[in-house]
Amino acid sequence: MQDEIIDFFRSPALLFYMTLMLTICVVNGSQQVGEVVETEFHAYRLHQYEISGNIYGCKNYRVSYEAVSLGARTLRRTMVTTWRDLLTTDVDDMWALSTGAVLIFIPDNLDELNDIDRKAFIDLEAKLLSAKTDLAVYVAPFNDDAVSILHDVNTRSEKAPTALQHLLQSLSGNTISITSSDQSPELPPSYKPLNIVGRLSSGDRAAPTIAFVAHYDTQSAVPGVSPGADSNGSGIVALLELLAVLSKFYDSPSTRPPYNILFIWTAAGKLNYQGTRHWIDEYQKGFDSADYAKSGLSRKGFSDDRVDLAICIEAIGRKTGGFFMHAGKTPSENSVAAQLLRRLKYFSSISPKKNIELVTKKISLTTVSAWEHEKFNIKRMPAITLSTLPSPSDPARNSILDLPSALDEDELIDNIRLIGEAVLGYILDLPESGPSSDSRVKSEATMLSKDAVDKQRVHHFIRQFASRPRPVGDQRATESITSNLASVAAGYGNVFKSAVTITDAKAFGVTQNRLVAERVKPAVFELVIAAGVFTYLSAFYYIATHSQNTIEGTVAAIRKSIF
C-alpha cells in the first residue's frame, strides 16, 4: 500500500490535473464578479468625402486598439471621450496626439439639449466638419454601456497615490480593447444614386416649363445619425405635396394650365449638387440615357421642355415667419423670378402674414456651389432657391440637430401653400395684385381650397422621407428612398429615374459600424500569471521527487500507531 500511495503522487496525471485546475482558477478569478466582459454597440463614422481631389473628414475606418482617456499621449490607441469634454479641448491637437482612433459619446436623445448645450454642440460640429484626419473617428450614443466603458477607461488613467498601488493597478487592472468589423468604405463601382423626375404635362410640346428641384440626401459631421429633417427633408416633402396638389389641375383638359411642370428629386446634393449637374447635362443633351428610354415616356416630351424657371427648395420647415428667395443677381422686372417674387409677397400679405426677402450672392466658379440654383445659373438657365436659411453657411444646414422635432408642420404647410399659390397665379396668368387692381377692394381670393394642402399627407411624407438618415454614401438608404419616392410620385404624374454619374467628387461608405469593447487584462498580467504557474510547477515537481522519505516515514508512523 505504501508503494501505491507513492506512485499516486508521482503520477503525471496528477501533475496535469493540478496544473489545469490552477490555470482555470486563475483565469476565472481575473474577472470581477458580475462584470460584462464584452460589449457590442453601433457607432457612426465621421464623414468622409472627396471633392476636386481633396478628401475631407476621416480617412480611416478600422479600429483595433486599447482604449485610453482624453489627453493620453500614447500611440496606436483609441481615445474615448464625451462631447462635453471635447468642448474645452483643441480638436486639432487631439488629431495630432493620437494615431489610432477616437470614440466620442454624444447624448442619446438630442432633443433634450437646452439652448446653451445646443449652441455648444453646434460649435463642436463645426470643428468636426472641418476636420481632416487619418484617424478612424466614431460617434456613439451615450447609454449604460458607455458609462461602464468610460468608468473603466478613466479609472485606469487615474494616477495612483503610491508607486506600489500604481504597479498593482498596472498589473491587475482591466483594459478596454475596442475593435470594429472589417468593412471597406469603397462603394461598389456599379452603385449610382438616382435622380427621380416627375412631370405634369399641359399636352402642348411647345408649352414652357416650370421645374421644382430638391436634393434628397443628407450630410453632417456624422451623416449616419443625421435625418436632415429640414435640410432637405422639408424640400422632399414640399415637392411631393406640390405634385399632389397641382396634379388635380392637370386631371381635366378644361382646367389644365398652359405650362408643363417638372418635379426633380436630385441625388448627391451635399456632394456639390452632383444630381443637379447630371440632370442639366442630360436636359441639354436631350435625355439619351438608358434609364430614360426604359421609362417608356416620350423622349420629345422632355427634350422639348423650355425651362422658364427652376425653383429649388431647401429647408422651409422651421418657424421663422417667412423665407428668402436666393438668386445670383437681382432679377429683371419682367423676368419669371421677379414675377414670382411679387406674387409670393402678395400672398404672404394674406393671413398668415410672412416676410419674403430677396438675397443675392455672386456665383463663384472656383469653389463648390453654395446653393442648388447656382448649377442652373452656371449653364445660363434661370433658377432661384427658396429657403428659410439666410445664408448657405448657416450651421443648421448640415447639423446632427436637424431633427424631425425641429420641424413645424403648420409652418411647412403654410410655406407649401404659399409657393403653390404663387406658381399657380403665374402659370394661369392671374393678376399679381389679386382679383382687383382697385386698392379699395379688399379680397383674399386664392386658387387653392382651404384643405388643398393635406395636413395628414404632409405628416405622412415627413415620417416616410424626413425622419431617417439618407447620406449618399449609404447605398441601402439611398436605394430605399429613391424607390419610395418614385412609387409615391407615380401616383400623381409620369415618373422616370436617371442614374447619376458622379464626377470630380467621391462618396465613401461605412457611415455606420459595429464596435466591440472587450475587457482584458494587460499583457504584463499574463507574464505574471505565467511566472506564478512556473513557480508552482517547480515547487510541486520538487516536492513530488523528494517526498518519498517523508511519505515512508509518515506511513510507518501511522502503521505503528495502529498496530
Curated annotation (Swiss-Prot):
Gene ablation phenotype (knockout): RNAi-mediated knockdown causes a moderate resistance to nicotine-induced paralysis. RNAi-mediated knockdown in neurons in a hyperactive mec-10 (A673V) mutant background increases touch neuron (TRN) cell death.
Record's keyword terms, sorted: Endoplasmic reticulum, Glycoprotein, Membrane, Signal, Transmembrane, Transmembrane helix
Tissue: Expressed in body wall, pharyngeal, and vulval muscles, excretory canal cell, head and motor neurons, and vulval epithelium.
Residues listed as glycosylation sites in the UniProt record: N232
Top-rank lineage group of the source organism: Eukaryota
PROSITE patterns according to UniProt: EF_HAND_1
UniProt topology in membrane: Single-pass type I membrane protein
GO cellular component, one term: endoplasmic reticulum
Gene3D superfamilies for this protein: Zn peptidases
Keyword check for Membrane: yes
Cytoplasmic face of the membrane: 544-563
UniProt signal peptide: 1-29
TM stretches of this protein: 523-543
Oligomer and partners: May interact with the levamisole-sensitive nicotinic acetylcholine receptor (L-AChR). May interact with nra-4 in the ER.
Role: Involved in the recognition and selection of protein complexes to exit the endoplasmic reticulum (ER). In muscles, regulates levamisole-sensitive nicotinic acetylcholine receptor (L-AChR) subunit composition, possibly by allowing only specific L-AChR subunit combinations to exit the ER. Specifically, may promote the inclusion of alpha subunits unc-38 and unc-29 into L-AChR. Regulates L-AChR sensitivity to agonists such as nicotine and levamisole at neuro-muscular junctions. In touch neurons, may prevent ER exit of incorrectly folded mec-4-mec-10 ion channel.
Name under which the protein is recorded: Nicalin
Organism for this UniProt entry: Caenorhabditis elegans
Gene symbol of the encoding locus: nra-2
